[in-house]
């Protein structure tokens, strides 16, 4: 890979001369009209297009999500699309508040076939498109600007005449100068005005002017400039709904759509997860959830995201990438130790304060808004720190480790992840915790225990303790059960035992909850280690933690 790439083959996209642009100073405050093109633009981009059952399943999903306008296909060019639309109408599957949309070219027999397909629909959008870019005019069609305008005008007139002969169906016209971003703005304006002049829309019955980035050719700000330029030059913008249909060739379809909305567009066409030709369409999930994250009702409901993903993948055969915004498996996941610690603390504070406003580090929205859970937010690999393991144990097991023990547990996890070379699942972390800090019964284990409080500061303990399989009956006094057990062990086994730290909490709410005890002990001046005890009797829990800690300390001294 020596030398530079052949960048000289390309020319910069020309900027728009916009003397007094307004969109940079605006803020989005409401959602646009949404139109799903999953069943048309999305479907045509599939290696294996959807069959009738998959299309119906997708249509029902889109309705459930809340789309009020759905492009169902190209019925004049596809027998399958024609039959699908007929089935929707005849089976009364289109809710009264949902409008179906169909694509058509400016040809008499195609327009006629389109109206045959939509017969009986309550309301329909007929989407007329005409390629207008300078490149297509020169390379594909060999037509002049006026010839292209004539084609669009003729098609509009035919649609208008068919609409007048179909009074039972409310017909809305949508016109797209295809490849708008590759079209000279004055020509895009001229052809749009010519179509508007024929259709004669009003503010009460507007037409849709769709200005697509059929191929994404520039930075998003230029697309916004183009939209603002068109709106400022249209003769009757009050009778026009400016619609967007951005492709993702440069990877900025969502940004281009958002900036173009600031420029005055009121309608967005796109697909779930950005499926579409080449690099895809605008991802309506991302645009809608971006609005949601700013406190704006997007009008679309993605609260059951796992089910939406499963349905989409089953219908399209396309998988949702793990880092797809808002939807991917890993978008609410942190592997970094510092990120995990911040998330854990943020979630704890949010719950503690019962906060109404969401504010958790590294989580721009609440995963539960999308039907996701907190547990997968933190995943453990060799880069993870103590906060991640602590979070998982708190969420899964109700075990809240003291900070010093988090450090000790993180060393255990680090050693395992380094050895295995992969991340650990939550159940594996739980198993490692119990294996290393709870189920340590060698050489010491605790049998029957009796203790009584003689005075407030003097307790008597009688305990059966097994050492390497040999059971001994021990007894001693101390200022509490733990102190008495330590005194008994020191006397009988000639150990020097020092307790450095002790914590205890209830594992769950309620009278029958287990007590979780954490005891940090050093033996014979060695390295302090933690042990954990779990029992419904709080005293027994603490005593088991003492023996577990001693066992771990003895094992450490031998390594």
UniProtKB/Swiss-Prot annotation:
It catalyses: 3-methyl-2-oxobutanoate + acetyl-CoA + H2O = (2S)-2-isopropylmalate + CoA + H(+). It holds the Pfam family LeuA_dimer. InterPro entries: 2-isopropylmalate_synth_dimer, AIPM/Hcit_synth_CS, Aldolase_TIM, IPM_Synthase, LeuA-like_post-cat, LeuA_allosteric_dom_sf, LeuA_N_DRE-TIM, PYR_CT. SUPFAM superfamilies: 2-isopropylmalate synthase LeuA, allosteric (dimerisation) domain, Aldolase, post-HMGL domain-like. It is found in: Cytoplasm. Its cofactor is Mg(2+). Disulfide bonds: none annotated. Gene3D superfamilies: 3.30.160.270, Aldolase class I. SMART domains: LeuA_dimer. It is an enzyme of class 2 (transferase). The keyword Cytoplasm applies. Keywords: Amino-acid biosynthesis, Branched-chain amino acid biosynthesis, Cytoplasm, Leucine biosynthesis, Magnesium, Metal-binding, Transferase. GO terms for molecular function: 2-isopropylmalate synthase activity; acetyl-CoA C-acetyltransferase activity; magnesium ion binding. One of its GO terms (cellular component) is cytoplasm. Pathway: Amino-acid biosynthesis; L-leucine biosynthesis; L-leucine from 3-methyl-2-oxobutanoate: step 1/4. Mg(2+) binds at residues 41, 245, 247, 281. Residues 440-559 are annotated as: Regulatory domain. One of its GO terms (biological process) is L-leucine biosynthetic process. Homodimer. Catalyzes the condensation of the acetyl group of acetyl-CoA with 3-methyl-2-oxobutanoate (2-ketoisovalerate) to form 3-carboxy-3-hydroxy-4-methylpentanoate (2-isopropylmalate). PANTHER family: 2-ISOPROPYLMALATE SYNTHASE, PTHR46911. This is 2-isopropylmalate synthase. It comes from Magnetococcus marinus (strain ATCC BAA-1437 / JCM 17883 / MC-1). The gene is leuA.
